[in-house]
């Protein structure tokens, strides 16, 4: 099948994912997503048919938000590694970055910030992969109940049943 990426045609096989096709044809390192037929999509998504693809980089508004979203997840992973007892609440992207609400036995202080930053850098340096997985609401609730994450369970229960639930792990 033919995949048009940034107005140039490339050959792809059914089942190829965007990331593989992009890696084979582009040297750019700051590609974080793609718009497939004008729909923002994850690079791990498979190519289903002839498509028009626009690459999204960290220089783009959508790309910057994806980078911030990834940083929030990296922060969450770093916190859980440093403080496994921490309850994760919510970590949304905002205009100038992101924040993460957490509940921990011992409140974080200024002294904790370099430790968290260093852990995030270590994870990033070793190419710590955070993958998106779409699952059912029931499965997501079961996962967070098993992890003893009541705030995540509460948030999931508030989401309408027809919404797509994606976990990043």
Place the predicted regions along the sequence by residue:
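Ubiquitin-like/PB1-type beta-grasp interaction modules and other compact soluble beta-rich domains
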Residues: 1-72, 76-97, 115-122
